[in-house]
């Protein structure tokens, strides 16, 4: 059996809706429990997007892949278009094919990539990348992948997507399909295909602003859409003295605060991309994006940002009897054998796309339209407000540094009156609204710009950055 498939099959995939834990700790807390965040399901909007109904569309991406056949369980069937778009209905399964070769059958989602189509097979993931990129008519996947109908029709059902990638790239079946489609140039090597897919990691992850929040805490991630990896992260979550393995001590490990820096992806597997970051500003210690575990992977299905980790399954402890506790009667101490296999499972937690009301206050707003390193304001539909501030007030840096605010708000769309009060978190001192509150929020007609006036009559021009 293929070693990569053996390793993946040893893992049990479970989804854990761990709300509002700092990004770097959420997965380990999901595995071990006893975290400092709110209880699961405790808010009006947490990780995980809302379930939709009816017809919708998704995109097949390495870069956009056109010319791949698809069939949705509700009946929609065609080829992906030049933007990689396919049609399906919420709740569908969708099967993708090239000619008679089944590429994979998956649950319909806003974004489907070879990671989803590959299931748990590392070889299949690599070979799908080689196949799609090598059938691109102009040989340049950077401008999209366009597979000619004649090439797709010539893809043989005998092609083994689980074979060794080097052998797959050299296979006669792949070359025949390329010749049938008039595709010139060389077949993409495994390294070339991998490098290109890695280059798409940050653009995929920046498709939305990602949030987890409830009535007591919030965590937000914004990655620049320019592709350069610039990011802003805010954590309004409780102080925690436990590390990612839930080993606790007297030293504070994570706290509410802000991160700003540059991020990238260094590798990938069937669970997602390995996220790496270089923070320039980091006031939240090990919370946020600056200290991910080595086994954490991140991907997006278009609606959610999905974080997963491989964790050790904790052995269940037998409950001692009351009699045994009282009289200190214990059985033989059970020692696990060195030969006993270590059981692991995959734990997942999710951020949802920031909600957005096109003609209302709900959404994300930034003080600078083009920069990520700017004060950013989040108005949630549950009446909660968060400010993520990577700059503070430079004129009073000692008391007004970078940080976050989390509070309640009320807004009257008729009078434009805005009130922000009841601050649960305030780590940027005098730089935000905790000392000089808001008085009005005046939306412009287009809904994309607004003027926020503070109680001291100073005004802030804001730009909608959620969508």
Q: What residue spans do the PLM features occupy?
A:
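Bacterial Sec-dependent N-terminal signal peptides
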Residues: 2, 25-54, 467
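N-terminal helix-cap/turn-to-beta initiation motif at the start of protein domains
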Residues: 199-211, 222, 348-366, 378
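Beta-strand-rich cores of mature extracytoplasmic or soluble domains
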Residues: 129-203, 295-315, 319-320
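Contiguous, well-ordered beta-strand patches that form the walls/edges
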Residues: 236-328, 337-340, 370-371, 389-457
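N-terminal low-complexity, Pro/Thr/Ser-rich intrinsically disordered segments
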Residues: 43-69, 202-206, 354-361
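Sec-dependent signal peptide recognition
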Residues: 16-26
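N-terminal secretory signal peptides that target proteins for export/translocation
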Residues: 1-15
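Beta-strand-dominated extracellular/periplasmic modules and repeats
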Residues: 49-169
